[in-house]
Curated annotation (Swiss-Prot):
Associated pathway: Sulfur metabolism; hydrogen sulfide biosynthesis; sulfite from sulfate: step 3/3
Family matches, as Gene3D superfamilies: HUPs
Organism: Synechococcus elongatus (strain ATCC 33912 / PCC 7942 / FACHB-805) (Anacystis nidulans R2)
Family to which this protein belongs: Belongs to the PAPS reductase family. CysH subfamily.
Active site: C228 (nucleophile)
This protein's encoding gene: cysH
UniProt KW keywords: Cytoplasm, Oxidoreductase
Main subcellular localisation: cytoplasm
CDD domains reported for this sequence: PAPS_reductase
Name of this chain's protein: Phosphoadenosine 5'-phosphosulfate reductase
Function text: Catalyzes the formation of sulfite from phosphoadenosine 5'-phosphosulfate (PAPS) using thioredoxin as an electron donor.
GO cellular component: cytoplasm
Reactions catalysed: [thioredoxin]-disulfide + sulfite + adenosine 3',5'-bisphosphate + 2 H(+) = [thioredoxin]-dithiol + 3'-phosphoadenylyl sulfate
Family annotation (HAMAP family): CysH
GO annotation, biological process: hydrogen sulfide biosynthetic process; sulfate assimilation, phosphoadenylyl sulfate reduction by phosphoadenylyl-sulfate reductase (thioredoxin)
Length: 232
């Protein structure tokens, strides 16, 4: 467990008006080699990858490969890894996709939230917990934003989660901020954006945005839930 920071209320108040780069710089100074970054290589992932590597070029970047990502995601990951010279750490579930399907079925086809949660625990949460442990992470940068889900609206920039600090430099950004940053720095967005996707995870539980969707995360998990478990 990392050394406890002083009052998180005070820290969040101090960081509230800071730019994302300044928040990352604070985190790099505070946590040093214990700081890691997670990425999904999703629609907007180039933003956090660029921000973080401008401050700390060799920061470990954790990518959880579920084995069910779209072809476009694997190609996008290769492009960004080469372009930004990422110190990429790829983690996967200890149970292969074929073995999981043989033992438990195609869990994503279920109408049960519990089955989706079981899938996410095996393919995402367990590998992430293992990655954080093996890399000796004391703090974890992510690109979540309040605009994305109801759960994320209540998040703070810095929180203590399961004995590690979760740090969210772009928590207050809106979609326009994301795309302005991508444009200003000539960064690519995920290829599926051009097909109407505003968020993308596994191929079987992501779809393009529709006119009647309440928010962008409604396009995930067939609308049964909004969080995969990594940021709960």
């Amino acid at each position: 467990m990392p050394a406890l920071l002083p009052s998180l209320t005070e820290i969040n108040a101090q960081l509230a008006d800071q730019a994302a780069t300044q928040i990352i710089q604070w985190a790099a100074t505070e946590f040093g080699s214990g700081l890691v970054l997670s990425t999904s290589f999703g629609i907007q992932s180039a933003v956090m990858l660029h921000l973080a590597t401008q401050v700390q070029p060799d920061i470990p970047v954790i990518w959880i490969d579920t084995g069910y990502l779209p072809t476009e995601t694997y190609r996008f990951a290769a492009e960004l890894t080469e372009r930004l010279k990422l110190n990429l750490k790829v983690y996967q579930s200890e149970i292969s996709p074929a073995r999981m399907e043989a033992l438990y079925g195609r869990l994503w086809e279920s109408e049960s939230v519990e089955d989706f949660n079981r899938y996410d625990q095996m393919r995402k949460v367990e590998p992430m917990n293992r990655a954080l442990q093996e890399l000796g992470a004391t703090a974890w940068l992510s690109g979540v934003r309040r605009q994305q889900t109801a759960h994320r609206q209540s998040m703070e920039i810095v929180e203590l989660k399961r004995d590690r600090y979760a740090i969210r430099p772009i928590l207050g950004w809106h979609s326009r901020d994301v795309y302005q940053y991508l444009t200003a720095h000539d960064l690519p967005y995920h290829p599926l954006f051009d097909q109407g996707y505003v968020t993308v995870g596994d191929w079987h539980s992501s779809r393009p945005l529709q006119a009647d969707d309440s928010d962008e995360r409604s396009t995930r998990f067939r609308g049964l839930k909004q969080e995969c478990g990594l940021h709960l």
